[in-house]
UniProtKB/Swiss-Prot annotation:
Gene Ontology CC terms, in alphabetical order: endoplasmic reticulum; endoplasmic reticulum membrane
Keyword Endoplasmic reticulum: yes
Family matches, as PROSITE patterns: ADH_SHORT
Function of the molecule: Component of the microsomal membrane bound fatty acid elongation system, which produces the 26-carbon very long-chain fatty acids (VLCFA) from palmitate. Catalyzes the reduction of the 3-ketoacyl-CoA intermediate that is formed in each cycle of fatty acid elongation. VLCFAs serve as precursors for ceramide and sphingolipids.
Source organism per UniProt: Eremothecium gossypii (strain ATCC 10895 / CBS 109.51 / FGSC 9923 / NRRL Y-1056)
Designated name of the protein: Very-long-chain 3-oxoacyl-CoA reductase
Superkingdom in the source lineage: Eukaryota
């Protein structure tokens, strides 16, 4: 018969064994979760590399290219919108060019018709004015034409970074009217035609909307613009679910800076492509997420933007305090430089 000390000793061993089992189980769980996370991270990086360098470009025949189909592009007179029009025409789409400056639209129309031998038509409208007649005119422009592609490119931002409380009512309303109201109204006008034409031509329809890193990351000193683009992300993803049963693909395209009048950046770099390079990557990546690995119906197509998006999303997080603070400092610096430049110009005029 064992002593009490022997019984206590064995009880202690059993307790240690039980604890070791629990500790080992926790360690294995942690290891498994870490391994899965690391594997997912590496596979996503490989996916980004393949999608930006190796995989073939998307085919546009399924949207009616070279079959008489039309693509409607808003904000088509300059920058990214102009490149969408040119590159869609090069793929065999007839194009409908909608923007404010008629002279630029007519010049682009002649260039497209001469270079790509497709039909091009123009409509000059001011999306900054919320007028129902604008959307009636767009409906009449489309008429009986087989429009299967809509590119929502039109957009505006703040003239310079500014705090929300100092943003003028005119600028605030202008941003919401162009970025949100106009985009929704154009889509509500054109998407039913896209659905009907896709069914009639036995092809798919496409609705592309230009988003921004300003909507991906809450951006201090661009609060209204940032909110307007974040709205488009949620709206576009919801619309994708609604139009999928109608054989219409919906995707929002996210970009960081691109050389353009809106960004006020003139020199291209590895992180800041030209509109031509950005649109080329967008059209090549259609239907893929590239840098937007965890976001439905979303694409961050340009290679450096894709890496930037993916790393932010998987490290500090797009809604983190750190990302917000970095964004604030970045745009505060831009504001200081813009104000100094304005002061110099004012001084030069007085002289």
């Amino acid at each position: 018969m064992g002593s009490l000390s022997d019984i206590s000793f064995f009880d202690h061993l059993q307790e240690l064994a039980r604890r070791d089992c629990c500790v080992n189980a926790l360690l294995w769980c942690a290891f498994t979760v870490g391994a899965v996370k690391l594997t997912t991270f590496m596979l996503s990086l490989i996916s980004i590399a393949l999608e930006t360098t190796v995989l073939p470009s998307a085919s546009y025949k399924k949207y009616g290219a070279r079959k008489g189909a039309y693509a409607l592009v808003t904000g088509a007179s300059d920058g990214i919108g102009k490149e969408f029009a040119l590159q869609l025409a090069s793929k065999g789409f007839n194009v409908l060019l909608v923007s404010r400056t008629e002279a630029k639209l007519l010049e682009l129309k002649q260039e497209i018709m001469a270079k790509y031998k497709v039909d091009a038509r123009v409509l000059s409208v001011d999306f900054g004015v919320d007028n129902r007649l604008t959307y009636t005119a767009i409906s009449e422009l489309c008429g009986e034409l087989p429009v299967t592609v809509l590119v929502n490119n039109v957009g505006v931002s703040h003239s310079i970074p500014v705090s929300f409380l100092e943003t003028t009512e005119e600028e605030l309303r202008g941003i919401i009217t162009v970025n949100n109201t106009a985009t929704l109204m154009v889509t509500q006008t054109v998407a039913p035609l896209v659905i009907a034409n896709a069914r009639r031509l036995q092809c798919r329809g496409l609705v592309l909307t230009m988003g921004s890193f300003g909507g991906l990351l809450p951006t201090p000193l661009l609060a209204t613009y940032s909110g307007s683009k974040a709205f488009l992300q949620a709206w576009s993803a919801a619309l994708a679910g609604e139009l999928a049963p109608h054989n219409v693909d919906v995707q929002i395209v996210l970009s960081y800076l691109v050389t353009s009048a809106m960004s006020k950046v003139r020199r291209a770099s590895a992180l800041i492509p030209t509109p031509r390079a950005f649109v080329r990557s967008t059209l090549a990546s259609l239907g893929r997420r590239v840098g937007a690995q965890e976001r439905y119906a979303t694409c961050t197509p340009y290679w450096s933007h894709a890496l930037y998006h993916f790393l932010i999303e998987n490290t500090v997080g797009v809604h983190s305090r750190l990302a917000n603070a970095i964004n604030y400092r970045f745009h505060a610096d831009i504001r200081k430089r813009a104000l100094r430049k304005a002061a110099r110009k004012a001084a030069e005029k007085q002289e």
